[in-house]
UniProtKB/Swiss-Prot annotation:
Tubulin is the major constituent of microtubules, a cylinder consisting of laterally associated linear protofilaments composed of alpha- and beta-tubulin heterodimers. Microtubules grow by the addition of GTP-tubulin dimers to the microtubule end, where a stabilizing cap forms. Below the cap, tubulin dimers are in GDP-bound state, owing to GTPase activity of alpha-tubulin. The gene is tbb-4. Residues 423-444 are annotated as: Disordered. Residues 429-444 have a biased composition (Acidic residues). Keywords: Cytoplasm, Cytoskeleton, GTP-binding, Magnesium, Metal-binding, Microtubule, Nucleotide-binding. InterPro entries: Beta-tubulin_BS (IPR013838), Beta_tubulin (IPR002453), Tub_FtsZ_C (IPR008280), Tubulin (IPR000217), Tubulin/FtsZ-like_C (IPR037103), Tubulin/FtsZ_2-layer-sand-dom (IPR018316), Tubulin/FtsZ_GTPase_sf (IPR036525), Tubulin_C (IPR023123). This is Tubulin beta-4 chain. It comes from Caenorhabditis elegans. Mg(2+) binds at residue 69.
Length: 444
């Protein structure tokens, strides 16, 4: 039954991942010991997508936890759902990657990668029909970015026909841990462009703005940010975990969302945005959900969709609501804002509805957009990258681990190409084709 193997790498990946398992265990009625005590058959119908049923009716996440230092994993193990995971699936080193992509990708991470692949292989073998992998990691550090992308390429090698999906936290200057984030992120994007099928770009800057502006939290903590991420991840994976009318699996999502193989970086959004304490006071209507969901303030990537155009969109609605009303509202959005959707992909908005709402609200909606505006995010990283790289600042940390400057140049130009590709399709119109054909003939 269409299983997904989950991998979380590095500090950020493990913290988001742990939160994700808390949220979905709660939604499926699974307590911290792995026992089921839910109240609806729907919770168990597709439980095996993310959980393995072990002896004694215990449910165990199909998860592999990876880090180059033991700290974060110890806190996951000590956390509320720490006893849920298989103890053998914790794989960690002692050295740490020190926020250095090269350590994660070429030296320290490369030593640990085979142990991780053993765990992944074991999880994959216990699946009936594996549909793919999902990874949570950040692009700014050393382990999640360097070792995370190494794992992705190794898994890609071994399971070339399975879908690879990532939830990637993109660094931002407003919440910065390290000065070399632009290097690590650029080197990672260079890998993600080639090796993943779908990447959800989660942007700390956007999460901060949401907490600060919308939720009125004056000093947002990582806990608050991760709460938003886990709501989004839960929403994105709803179709995979519950039976529904438009039963998305990872492959169907990819087929609907990715018009060109390199342009698979999605902007997630979520509605209603409520802070942890004030969820129960007001119930939203379908029109309000739809309107909020397309609002730039609700996007988890700090890009303004009004600066670009949507190639494709997927929306997941959750809760008891009328399909008819949902369809009407979605059409309404498209008709009113038709200039923000490319006209050369007709029907480029897909909607799914699932009956089970997330905890604490009657209805919710999750938004996944493939928008050309995501180029703003890559431009931002690219500018910071170039500023340091032209002075060769901090490069010795990377060349010291055996990297070549050439690799930086390649990553830089690959990311710039990606930006131009998005720009090209943003400007393309339905009647451009004639021109392209003529060019082809000249070439011959």
């Amino acid at each position: 039954m269409r299983e997904i193997v989950h991998i979380q790498a590095g500090q950020c990946g493990n913290q988001i991942g742990a939160k994700f398992w808390e949220v979905i265990s709660d939604e499926h009625g699974i307590d911290p010991t792995g026992a089921y005590n839910g109240d609806s058959d729907l919770q168990l119908e597709r439980i095996n997508v993310y959980y393995n049923e072990a002896s004694g009716g215990k449910y165990v996440p199909r998860a592999c936890l990876v880090d180059l230092e033991p700290g974060t994993m110890d806190s996951v193990r000590a956390g509320p759902f720490g006893q849920l995971f298989r103890p053998d699936n914790f794989v960690f080193g002692q050295s740490g990657a020190g926020n250095n992509w090269a350590k994660g990708h070429y030296t320290e991470g490369a030593e640990l990668v085979d142990n991780v692949l053993d765990v992944v292989r074991k999880e994959a073998e216990s699946c009936d029909c594996l549909q793919g992998f999902q990874m949570t990691h950040s692009l700014g550090g050393g382990t999640g970015s360097g070792m995370g992308t190494l794992l992705i390429s190794k898994i890609r090698e071994e399971y070339p026909d399975r879908i690879m999906m990532t939830f990637s936290v993109v660094p931002s200057p407003k919440v910065s841990d390290t000065v070399v984030e632009p290097y690590n992120a650029t080197l990672s994007v260079h890998q993600l462009v080639e090796n993943t099928d779908e990447t959800f770009c989660i942007d700390n800057e956007a999460l901060y703005d949401i907490c600060f502006r919308t939720l009125k939290l004056t000093t947002p903590t990582y806990g608050d940010l991760n709460h938003l991420v886990s709501m989004t991840m839960s929403g994105v994976t709803t179709c995979l975990r519950f039976p529904g009318q438009l039963n998305a699996d990872l492959r169907k999502l990819a087929v609907n969302m990715v018009p060109f193989p390199r342009l698979h970086f999605f902007m997630p959004g979520f509605a209603p945005l409520t802070s942890r304490g004030s969820q129960q006071y007001r119930s939203l209507t379908v029109p309000e959900l739809t309107q909020q969901m397309f609002d730039a303030k609700n996007m988890m990537a700090a890009c303004d969709p009004r600066h670009g155009r949507y190639l494709t969109v997927a929306a997941m609605f959750r809760g008891r609501m009328s399909m008819k009303e949902v369809d009407e509202q979605m059409l309404n959005v498209q008709n009113k804002n038709s200039s923000y959707f490319v006209e050369w992909i007709p029907n480029n908005v897909k909607t799914a509805v699932c009956d089970i709402p997330p905890r604490g609200v009657k209805m919710a909606a999750t938004f996944v957009g493939n928008s050309t505006a995501i180029q703003e995010l890559f431009k931002r990283i690219s500018e910071q990258f170039t500023a340091m790289f032209r002075r060769k600042a901090f490069l010795h940390w990377y060349t010291g681990e055996g990297m070549d400057e050439m690799e930086f140049t390649e990553a830089e130009s690959n990311m710039n190409d990606l930006v131009s590709e998005y720009q090209q399709y943003q400007e393309a119109t339905a009647d451009d084709e004639g021109e392209f054909d003529e060019h082809d003939q000249d070439v011959e």
